[in-house]
Every structure is written in C-alpha cells, then in structure tokens.
Amino acid sequence: LAVAGVLSISDAVKLVLERGRLMQGACDERPGGMAAIIGLDEVTAEEICRESGAQMSTINTEQQIILAGDHHSLAMAIDIASARGAKKAIPLQVGGAFHSGLMSPAQNGLNAMIDSLDFQDPLVPLIGNVTAQSLTTSEQVKDELRMQLTSCVQWNNTVKFMLSDGIENFYEIGHGKVLSGMVKRINRRANVSNIGDFESVLAYASNG
C-alpha cells in the first residue's frame, strides 16, 4: 500500500500494528486454528465445511485448501477430509482461525482504524486477494482491507487473474519459496523469482 502511494509509510505501519493487536484480541476471545487439506477440490472442501462447521480460509491452489474454525470443528473437518481421500489433512501451527468468522470481534476496531487514515487512489493497480480483481480507487482498497479480516483468501483466483491480465513475472519478496511454489502449481509457465537476501536484491537491481 505504501509503495503504491495508497498510504504513507507511517500510516501503513499504524494499520499493521493495530490490525495485529485486534486480531490477537479476537484469537483470545474466540480460540481456533487452521488446517491444510491437500488433494481435494473446492467443492469437496465446501461439503466438509458444511458437515464440520469449519470455514474455508484460503484457496491456495485447486488441490490445496486451508480451513479455519474452532478446535472441535477443525478436528472433525480433518477426520472427514481423511475419509474422503485427502492426500494430507493436517493442523497448522498458527495462533488463530484467521480469515474466518472467528476474527469478527476485531472487525469494528479495524473499520475504525481504516476510516481514521488518509487513503489515496493507487498509483498502480493493486489486486485484492478476496475479490481477485484490480483495485484502482482508495474506496476499493478500504473495502478489500475490511473484507480480508473474515473472508477467504482467493490466492488461486488471484494468480489466475494476474496471468489473464498479461502478468508473466512473479517476485516473492522475503525468505522462503512457498508462494513461488504455489504460483508454479497454478501455472507452470509463470516465471517466478525470489528476492530474499541482499545478494538477490543486488541481482534484481542489476538486471532491472
């Protein structure tokens, strides 16, 4: 958001800190967790959620879906997924049921924080990971930020949207290659690069 000119760096930091504080409060008020389901499609995952009470939190790829919910619902979802033939159905080591309804206690506080900051229209289009669409106005960005708290992350559709929009090169900034691997699984023709240390920053700058 700061790079795109939507928020100043100081306001972006304020938003990150307040969002984290509010989410921790929601975790304390409504404990839960997340689980990875690998090898089942979205339709089957939706059925598992209806039967268990869990919710879809992130659709990483067509065959990798993250569920969130209270601990009882998640345990039930893992059992159902295993019975349905999932390659893996495992709990994740996280502190809460992120991107699900269990984060709703943080919603009013986040909305107030967003409303208090000075948002500008993006200098370049952003892509929302809830709507999987371009965000070109400050109001669209604010709506996306509000929805992200309790809505499923549509990573699979987000990457597909970027590919359909002519984006061919993907850069993962930070340590690790998890997102790069997901992009490759979504479309093997995508060009992915990692910028995770000072040397890779210099290499990118020299090729830019």
Regions found by a protein language model. Give the residues of each.
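N-terminal entry module detector
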Residues: 1-4, 206-208
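Alpha/beta catalytic cores of group-transfer enzymes, especially the acyltransferase/condensing modules
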Residues: 2-150
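Acyltransferase/transacylase module recognition
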Residues: 118-208
